[in-house]
Amino acid sequence: MDPILLLKALILGIVEGLTEFLPISSTGHLILAGDLLNFNDDRGKLFEIVIQSGAILAVVWEYRERLLKVARGAFSEPAAQKFILNLFVAFLPLAILGLAFGRAIKAHLFNPVTVASTFILGAFVILWAERREHKIRIQTVDEMSMLDALKLGIAQAFALIPGTSRSGATIIGGLLFGLSRKAATEFSFFLAIPTLIVATFYQLYKERALLNADDLAMWAVGFVAAFVSAFLCVRWLLRYISTHDFTAFAWYRIAFGIVVLATWQFGWVQWAAD
């Protein structure tokens, strides 16, 4: 396979891994990177779907002991059953609204103005959330009730709007609903597993006609790059939030929103839904 194509796969895999679990939206970054690398055709979009699974696996690997414990106790331990039920409840809002409005959102909201506006608006939400008084009532994920899970699921549903950031919506939603930084961040990671797995398989099924065995090497490079970078990013974020808030990500979102508007206004990037 073309070494240049493999290099593009490596770069995009790293971009996916570094942005998937930070509150900065992976979608906007992949669009920009894909266009700069001239890899934004249907083949490139399918590639983005494939490498998402690498990022998912990174979270599964990081929390493998916890997840195995939950799996073993799924039919016998109340704590494990509560954890699974909370994830299911939190997953439902995005799944239902995505099926109902996904096509309309892609057709009408996937444009540079919406993406940039959402980036910037999301930044101000983060700044506001960080400046308000935090009343923490939930220190760990295990303390969450089904209602808490539903609230975070509703927050995650805002990620259907391009540029919102799934992780950003759930983490900041968690802070607003009284979760500690660690609990909000970890639940966002756990919720990513069913959410991204279902989204990945659904998109792969829709685009199955584009699947080609000749692209296996490219997918493998991107998958590994996404896995490694996402794993390192998850580890880093857990350390970062122990001593920092999310304000820096807000300022980054504002800067990136301005970049999106500039690239669109001057025609530097082909911001298109299809």
UniProtKB/Swiss-Prot annotation:
It is an enzyme of class 3 (hydrolase). Its EC number is 3.6.1.27. Coiled coil: none annotated. Its main location: membrane. Keywords: Antibiotic resistance, Cell inner membrane, Cell membrane, Cell shape, Cell wall biogenesis/degradation, Hydrolase, Membrane, Peptidoglycan synthesis, Transmembrane, Transmembrane helix. It catalyses: di-trans,octa-cis-undecaprenyl diphosphate + H2O = di-trans,octa-cis-undecaprenyl phosphate + phosphate + H(+). InterPro entries: UppP. The chain crosses the membrane at residues 4-24, 46-63, 82-102, 109-129, 184-204, 218-238, 249-269. GO terms for cellular component: plasma membrane. It is found in: Cell inner membrane. It is a multi-pass membrane protein. One of its GO terms (molecular function) is undecaprenyl-diphosphatase activity. Disulfide bonds: none annotated. GO terms for biological process: cell wall organization; peptidoglycan biosynthetic process; regulation of cell shape; response to antibiotic. PANTHER family: UNDECAPRENYL-DIPHOSPHATASE. Bacitracin is thought to be involved in the inhibition of peptidoglycan synthesis by sequestering undecaprenyl diphosphate, thereby reducing the pool of lipid carrier available. Belongs to the UppP family. HAMAP family: Undec_diphosphatase. Catalyzes the dephosphorylation of undecaprenyl diphosphate (UPP). Confers resistance to bacitracin. This is Undecaprenyl-diphosphatase. The lineage of its organism: Bacteria, Pseudomonadati, Pseudomonadota, Betaproteobacteria, Rhodocyclales.
